[in-house]
């Protein structure tokens, strides 16, 4: 099921499983996972997109390998919280995951996650070239941590 309400998402997620997070891009997807206590997000990897079938297959494989029970996907909303054109594509992708794998997915506003990731990497001394190669997985980590913070204040 696709969730936009953190209360509903919290009720639907297995308590002893990790949560996987995706920061969707046209060419690549940043991936992060929570720990099993669902308190801490950790950047995992960047997946370079191929086609829908391969993308879904790869994401499902690492979802299972990392003992995940639910998923968060970043949604790029405008400043006034209206959806961007890219949101429609992300929602369609999320619905394909749900239909194929029966996973609960929460859509988290991803506003400024890439800017925060880039800035964080810059102040740690990582070069712009290297930063561009890893900022999507850091963005996924930021998006997931926002969700974890939300659901842990509800618990």
From Swiss-Prot:
The family assignment reads: Belongs to the YqgF nuclease family.
Keyword Plastid in record: no
Fetch the Pfam families from UniProt. Answer: RuvX
Report the main location listed first in the record: cytoplasm
Q: Which domain of life is it from?
A: Bacteria
Q: State the top-level EC class.
A: hydrolase
**Keywords on record:** Cytoplasm, Hydrolase, Nuclease, Ribosome biogenesis
Q: Could you tell me which InterPro entries the record lists for this protein?
A: RNaseH-like_sf, YqgF, YqgF/RNaseH-like_dom, YqgF/RNaseH-like_dom_sf
Q: What GO biological process terms does the UniProt entry carry, in alphabetical order?
A: rRNA 5'-end processing
Q: Give EC number(s), comma-separated.
A: 3.1.-.-
Cellular compartments annotated: Cytoplasm
GO-annotated cellular components: cytosol
What does the UniProt function comment say about this protein?
Could be a nuclease involved in processing of the 5'-end of pre-16S rRNA.
What is a single molecular function from GO for this protein? nuclease activity
Q: What is this protein called?
A: Putative pre-16S rRNA nuclease
């Amino acid at each position: 099921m696709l969730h936009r309400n953190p209360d509903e998402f919290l009720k639907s997620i297995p308590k002893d499983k990790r949560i996987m997070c995706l920061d969707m891009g046209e060419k690549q997807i940043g991936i992060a996972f929570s720990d099993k206590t669902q308190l801490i997000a950790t950047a995992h990897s960047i997946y370079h997109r191929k086609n829908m079938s391969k993308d879904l297959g790869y994401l499902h494989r690492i979802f299972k390998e990392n003992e995940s029970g639910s998923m968060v996907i970043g949604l790029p909303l405008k400043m006034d919280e209206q959806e961007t054109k890219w949101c429609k594509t992300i929602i369609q992708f999320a619905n394909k995951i749900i239909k194929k794998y029966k996973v609960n997915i929460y859509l988290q506003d991803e506003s400024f996650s890439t800017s925060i990731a880039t800035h964080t990497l810059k102040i740690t001394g990582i070069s712009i070239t290297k930063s561009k190669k890893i900022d999507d997985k850091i963005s996924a980590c930021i998006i997931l941590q926002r969700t974890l913070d939300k659901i842990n204040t509800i618990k």
